[in-house]
């Protein structure tokens, strides 16, 4: 995702899975319980201190300036359910299945998996999803506002292309600022700081900022008030 975020040729990031005809389709079935550690993280032997690395991915998805589209076929449950929620948009095939399973196996997500879910579908529905651990069809997910659209499996790829091409025609800076603004209230001061970062970058491109920089380099006082846009 880091490469896609920094690649100027990429306008939209698609998050999906490799569907095989020989296996039950799944977007993501959640965390691997075989490497879940008693130390509170997931330990696959690669780190001395287990930690929830998926949280790093969730934060990265939220902070990424480019739109992220989750394309779901089959199961998106547990951690996979949270993963698609952290994407900006979710487009699903008609065989998609959504839901939480954590409490069945002594697991829970007290971060985006709970807070963002409640903001998306409402308090009562979020509690139902966590407290009952039942599965929801693509149509049910669409009705509760959990996803954006459902398409027949054989039409999904083409429809995703339509969504992506439309976003690719829009201003990338406008999309980045809109994403940061939408996330800001939920992400607290970190979200507000990210939105402020976009504003700072845009300010650096202004005539006022250029005048300030050039005046400093030339050893003179800046003449901000002579710039037409300086109205404050």
Predicted regions and their residues:
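C-terminal long alpha-helix characteristic of the crotonase
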Residues: 2-5, 91-96, 138, 147-195, ...
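Short hydrophobic/charged patches on amphipathic alpha-helices used for structural packing
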Residues: 1-2, 58, 81, 201
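Acidic-histidine catalytic/liganding microenvironments
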Residues: 7, 64-65, 144, 206, ...
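Conserved hydrophobic packing residues within short motifs/helices of P-loop NTPase cores
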Residues: 13-15, 69
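Glycine- (often His-adjacent) and acidic-residue-rich active-site loop
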Residues: 2, 9, 16-63, 76, ...
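Crotonase-fold acyl-CoA enzyme core
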Residues: 59-175
């Amino acid at each position: 995702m880091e490469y896609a975020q920094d690649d100027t040729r990429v306008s939209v990031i698609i998050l999906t899975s490799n569907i095989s005809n020989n296996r039950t389709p799944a977007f993501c079935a959640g965390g691997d319980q075989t490497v879940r550690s008693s130390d509170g993280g997931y330990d696959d032997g690669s780190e001395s201190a287990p930690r929830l690395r998926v949280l790093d991915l969730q934060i990265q998805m939220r902070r990424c300036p480019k739109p992220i589209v989750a394309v779901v076929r089959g199961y998106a449950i547990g951690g996979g359910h949270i993963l698609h929620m952290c994407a900006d948009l979710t487009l699903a095939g008609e065989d998609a299945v959504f839901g939480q399973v954590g409490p069945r196996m002594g697991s829970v997500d007290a971060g985006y998996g709970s807070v963002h879910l409640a903001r998306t579908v409402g308090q009562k529905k979020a509690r139902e999803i966590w407290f009952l651990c039942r599965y929801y069809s693509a149509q049910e997910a669409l009705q509760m506002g959990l996803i954006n659209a459902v398409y027949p499996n054989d039409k999904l790829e083409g429809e995703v292309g339509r969504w992506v091409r439309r976003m690719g025609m829009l201003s990338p800076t406008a999309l980045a600022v809109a994403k940061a603004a939408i996330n800001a209230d939920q992400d607290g001061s970190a979200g507000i700081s990210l939105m402020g970062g976009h504003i700072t970058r845009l300010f650096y491109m202004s005539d006022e900022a250029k005048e300030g920089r050039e005046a400093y380099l030339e050893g003179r006082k800046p003449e901000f008030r002579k710039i037409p846009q300086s109205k404050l």
